C-alpha cells in the first residue's frame, strides 16, 4: 500500500495539468512575472498548500468523485 503522503498518479496528473493555469491566473493583470507565479505555484504544490490552485482543483475533483461513489 502507498503511504498517504504520496498522491495517486491520477491526482498528480491533475495537479500538474492545473499548475500552469493557476500560474497564469495569478500573473494576469499583476506586477508579478509569469516565471515568479509559476515558481510560487510549484513550491506551493510541493508543500501541498491548500491555497495552491492546482492542489485546490485536485482536492475538489477527488471530493466530488468520492461523493459520487
Swiss-Prot record:
Pfam families, per the entry: Ribosomal_S7 (PF00177)
Gene Ontology molecular function terms on file: rRNA binding
Keyword match Transport: no
Keyword presence, Amino-acid biosynthesis: no
Gene3D superfamilies, sorted: Ribosomal protein S7 domain (1.10.455.10)
GO cellular-component term (any): ribosome
Keyword annotations from UniProtKB, A to Z: Ribonucleoprotein, Ribosomal protein, RNA-binding, rRNA-binding
Assembly with partners or alone: Part of the 30S ribosomal subunit.
Functional description taken from the UniProt entry: One of the primary rRNA binding proteins, it binds directly to 16S rRNA where it nucleates assembly of the head domain of the 30S subunit. Is located at the subunit interface close to the decoding center.
Family that this chain belongs to: Belongs to the universal ribosomal protein uS7 family.
Protein name: Small ribosomal subunit protein uS7
Lineage: Archaea, Methanobacteriati, Methanobacteriota, Stenosarchaea group, Methanomicrobia
Amino acid at each position: 500500500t502507498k503511504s498517504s503522503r504520496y498522491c495517486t498518479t491520477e491526482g498528480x496528473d491533475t495537479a500538474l495539468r492545473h499548475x500552469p493555469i493557476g500560474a497564469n491566473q495569478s500573473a494576469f493583470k499583476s506586477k508579478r512575472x509569469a516565471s515568479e507565479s509559476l515558481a510560487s505555484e510549484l513550491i506551493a504544490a510541493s508543500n501541498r498548500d491548500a491555497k495552491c490552485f492546482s492542489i485546490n482543483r485536485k482536492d475538489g475533483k477527488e471530493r466530488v468523485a468520492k461523493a459520487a461513489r
